[in-house]
Amino acid sequence: NLLADGPGVVVMDRAALEAVNAVDPMITLATVPPYQQMGESGMVATIKIISYALPESTVEAACAAAGEGALRLAPPVLRDATLIITDVPGGAGDKGRAAVEGRLTALNVTLCDVVTVPHRSAPLAEAIAAAETDLVLILTASATSDINDVAPSALRAAGGEVTRFGMPVDPGNLLFLGQLGTRAVIGLPGCARSPALNGA
C-alpha cells in the first residue's frame, strides 16, 4: 500500500497508471480518485501481484511504465486562514465555523481569525481588506448567486478580483475564487456549513 506522508491532494498521470495496469493482468494498481484530499497515512494506492510472483522483467516493465511522478501528493501551500461570516437577523450565524475549521485542520492550515459582519458589501469589504492571512474564506448569510452579489462585490471593493465564479460541483456550485494581492480568497457555498463531503 502507498500511504500519504502528510496531508494533501492526490495528483496523478492517468495514462501512466493505466500503462502500469496494461503490462500484465497479474499486476494491479488501484488508486483513490484524482484530486482526492488525503490525511497523513491515508491509503493513496494499493499494488497487488495477484499471482504472488512474476518474472522480474514483468515487474521492471510495470515500474518503467509508471515512470517518475505518475502518482504524487500535492501538499498544502497556504499556512493560515481568516473566516469571514456575514450575518442577517435570524440567520445561521457561525453555524459553519466548526465544519470549515475541520477542513482547514485536516490540511494543516491554521484558522487564525473568525470575523462576523453584517451581510452588506461595505463591512465585508473592510473585513476582507483587514485580513492578513494567506487565505480568506467568506461564508455568506445567503447564497452567492450572482457575480455582483454581496461577497464578489465586496472583494472588488477591497481591491481584489474574482477569478472564477461558480464551480461544476454539486453541492457547492455557488462557490467563487478570487485574489487580493498575494492572498487567495474563496467565497464558500452554503453547503460548507455541513461537515458532509461537498464542493467546499
Question: Could you describe each region identified by the protein language model?
Answer:
Residues V9-V10, Y52-A53, G90-G91, R193-P195:
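Short, acidic Gly/Pro/Ser/Thr-rich loop/turn segments
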Residues G8-D13, T46-A53, L78, R103-A106, ...:
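Generic detector of short, locally flexible boundary/turn motifs and exposed helical patches
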Residues S51-V136:
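Phosphate-binding glycine-rich loops and their immediate beta-loop-alpha structural context
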Residues P33-G39, L78, K95, A99, ...:
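Conserved active-site and cofactor/substrate-binding residues in soluble primary-metabolism enzymes
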